[in-house]
Amino acid sequence: MSITAERKAEVIKDNARDKGDTGSPEVQVAILTDRINTLTEHFKTHRKDNHSRRGLLMMVNKRRSLLDYLRKKDEGRYQALIAKLGLRK
């Protein structure tokens, strides 16, 4: 369950720090969040798809690592990102 190229380009454009930015932690977290949300919808109808569930858990762990890195490097960017993506309650 991947996202389309158009959707990915839109996510990159919305979260890029400057033009051509595709590798910053903000962009990577936003892409992972979009993929995680897509897989979450997939699991509502395919409850026993354990192969994809493993991929989901790996994505969640990767996102957690990137968020930890960003919080350590720049707290302000971290707070802005989680507010924008709605990750924390």
Swiss-Prot record:
CDD domains assigned to the protein according to its UniProt record, in alphabetical order: Ribosomal_S15p_S13e
Gene3D superfamilies associated with the record: 6.10.250.3130, S15/NS1, RNA-binding (1.10.287.10)
Q: Do the record's keywords include Cell cycle?
A: no
Question: Could you state a single Gene Ontology molecular function term?
Answer: rRNA binding
Sequence ranges of Basic and acidic residues compositional bias = 1-21
Give the signal sequence positions: none
Q: Which HAMAP family match?
A: Ribosomal_uS15_B (MF_01343_B)
Q: What does this protein do?
A: One of the primary rRNA binding proteins, it binds directly to 16S rRNA where it helps nucleate assembly of the platform of the 30S subunit by binding and bridging several RNA helices of the 16S rRNA. Forms an intersubunit bridge (bridge B4) with the 23S rRNA of the 50S subunit in the ribosome.
Please state what the protein is called: Small ribosomal subunit protein uS15
Task: Please name the gene that encodes this protein.
Answer: rpsO
